[in-house]
Amino acid sequence: MAAIKLRQRRKDDLMDRKKITNFLGNLLVQEKFSGMGKYWAREVSIDPWAAKGKPKRVDFMQFVPDGQCAVSAIERGIFVCYEIKSCKKDVYSGNGLNFLGEKNYIVTTMECYKELLQDLRDGTFARHLYEVAPGSSFHFGIMVAVPFMSEITDEFENPTKIDSENGRWKLSVIKQCNPGLRTRPMAELLFCMLRSGH
């Protein structure tokens, strides 16, 4: 009986994680990628034919040109990578965290951010990032989902449970990303985005 309850709890947990992941992904698309002049792709595969353990996939990748009227403006564009993480367990799953852009963000819940705070401060997260994704940039920020009319400080004190059915939500940057250098060529990343599509 206990084993059945444990299996059911794991199944419910997985469903909750899946719902939260979908919610965060849809919110990101709605907030950051809608409108004209937005260049982005979902589930961008990098090195898909590499040996086992080497292929990378970025949940969302965006190309932000400096302008669109001159080639030089396009060449000055930057890449922003977004990794969706529903909970702390998801962060440490060994999947994702492929920070290949000049800017990179973890998109998560306030609850998950609060659980990660100590690991961010004491270097636990940095060590994990280096172990599971050695080519990833340490230039990353964190965005959290908060109810539309809420202040981020209030949400930090008393997080609202994610509920896609009720109310409007927004993404707020709780940890800024300082841009870093990209190691992959622009042509390669644009090709990977094009191959992945939406």
Regions found by a protein language model. Give the residues of each.
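Short, flexible loop/turn elements at secondary-structure junctions
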Residues: 44-46, 62-64, 85-88, 110
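Active-site beta-strand-loop-beta-strand hairpin of nuclease catalytic cores
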Residues: 53-81, 87, 95-99
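Short, well-ordered coil/turn elements that cap or connect secondary structure elements
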Residues: 35, 76, 99-101, 137
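Short regulatory "switch" loops immediately downstream of catalytic or recognition motifs
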Residues: 61-69, 109-121, 146-148
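Non-catalytic C-terminal interaction segments of nucleic acid-processing enzymes
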Residues: 2-31, 35-40, 48-52, 124-198
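Accessory alpha/beta interaction modules
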Residues: 15-26, 81, 86, 91-99
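Hydrophobic/aromatic beta-strand patches that form the interior of the parallel beta-sheet core
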Residues: 82, 105, 141-143
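Short, charged, amphipathic alpha-helix that recurs within catalytic cores of restriction-modification
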Residues: 85-133
